[in-house]
């Protein structure tokens, strides 16, 4: 038996309301139970270290033999604070279309950033694309900028695919998608 416990409805922030709820329904059909515990949980163990249960802060207890935690990603950029490199409020590195970091005290192109830590300009705002395909594309952009200077901008394709619970997702556009998704093949039922 698998139980997913989250502080908010899982997948909705990533996939949007429609696809997030569709995935949760498919998970439920495959025997996965989902619990929302906004105040968090406490993992309780035996003296031996063996997990006994997980208890929500509102008092609900869930028996458990194994606990796997996945708490998302946070930038490890504390060491950049005060360096002049521009960071957003959460600590992500702000870059331009050539993967060059913004900031003060250094020339454009002296500091570059790629991958999950970089905040990219897209459609008039800065966004993260924490996906392996984007990390590879940004690494190539960094290499081009280092070798040739800022000649070719990096424009990621806002696309990804995955499979979960028998559903194949191919998503193009900003994530989470705003509004209802357009179904090109198949249906949402």
Regions found by a protein language model. Name each.
Residues 1-42, 131-132, 156-164:
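Rossmann-like dinucleotide-binding cores of NAD(P)H-dependent redox enzymes
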Residues 10-13, 43, 77, 102, ...:
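Flexible, glycine-rich phosphate/dinucleotide-binding loops
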Residues 33, 86-88, 150:
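Short coil/loop linkers at secondary-structure junctions
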Residues 46-55, 61-137, 141:
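FAD-site-proximal beta/loop scaffold in flavoenzymes
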Residues 56-57, 164:
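Structural motif
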Residues 59-60, 167:
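Well-ordered beta-strand scaffold positions
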Residues 117-189:
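Mid-to-C-terminal Rossmann-like scaffold of FAD/NAD(P)H-dependent oxidoreductases
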